[in-house]
A protein has these predicted regions:
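Short hydrophobic "helix-edge" motifs at membrane interfaces and signal-peptide entry regions
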Residues: 1, 82-84, 142-144
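Catalytic adenosine-cofactor/nucleotide-binding cores of aminoacyl-tRNA synthetases and other
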Residues: 1-70, 166-193
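Secondary-structure capping and boundary motifs in well-ordered enzyme cores
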Residues: 5-6, 35-46, 71-79, 91-101, ...
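Short, charged/polar, low-complexity loop and linker segments
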Residues: 27-32, 80-88
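Basic, alpha-helical terminal appendages of large translation-related enzymes
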Residues: 28, 88, 93-94, 103-196
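Short, hydrophobic, well-ordered secondary-structure elements
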Residues: 44, 48-58, 99, 103-106, ...
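Conserved, charged catalytic cores of large soluble enzymes
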Residues: 51-86, 110-126
Length: 196
């Protein structure tokens, strides 16, 4: 039933799943097995894990203040590609395509953490590079909060607030295009998508 689906992972996760799997114009089959799989892979291990890791590192290494840093080309390019893909998808009411743009940026940002190894940069006292990495991750999260707002409004708002941003992410398209977040005070939110 709908009630048990909402209880299982929350209303935003169900909304995301239905938009991603079915959209507006398609018939779809719902299974708890598929709902659980998408929740775990894309939300808990994807967006939730990214937000948790990135915000925890900004807290740990920079006292919760987003540093100013140069552009991290690979992550910036991924963010711009995600924005373009998302805009095209939403203009065509392709909600699955919009969700795929979000997942693509989440995947890129999680991979960026692995490759850039902020913990190693901190240990090596490479402050300039660490600042650039943390700033790039914060910018990616701003973009993700804006992109997620139509599909998961409550979770996007929680991420937006954790990023120290005023207002709501659904009014932030310009912020997604040019995320100026340096100097913002971030807090690690309560786990956005708890793992089962």
């Amino acid at each position: 039933s709908l009630d048990s689906a909402v209880v299982r992972h929350g209303p935003d996760a169900l909304r995301y799943f239905l938009m991603r799997e079915v959209g507006f114009s398609n018939d779809g089959d719902f299974s708890f097995e598929r709902f659980d799989a998408v929740y775990e892979s894309e939300l808990a291990n994807g967006l939730g894990n990214l937000a948790s890791r990135a915000l925890a590192m900004i807290e740990k290494y920079r006292g919760g203040i987003v540093p100013s840093g140069g552009e991290a080309e690979s992550l910036e390019a991924a963010g711009e590609r995600a924005l373009m893909a998302y805009a095209v998808a939403m203009d065509g009411t392709d909600l699955k395509g919009a969700a795929e743009a979000i997942v693509a940026l989440v995947t890129e940002a999680n991979g960026y953490i692995t490759v850039s190894a902020p913990w190693a940069l901190a240990k090596a006292n490479d402050d300039a590079r660490l600042d650039a990495v943390l700033a790039a991750l914060a910018r990616a999260l701003v973009r993700l909060a804006v992109l997620a707002a139509p599909l998961m409004p409550a979770k996007a708002a929680a991420l937006w607030t954790a990023l120290g941003q005023a207002g709501t992410p659904d009014a932030g398209w310009e912020r997604a295009q040019a995320p100026a977040i340096a100097g913002a005070r971030v807090v690690k939110p309560e786990n956005l998508f708890p793992r089962e």
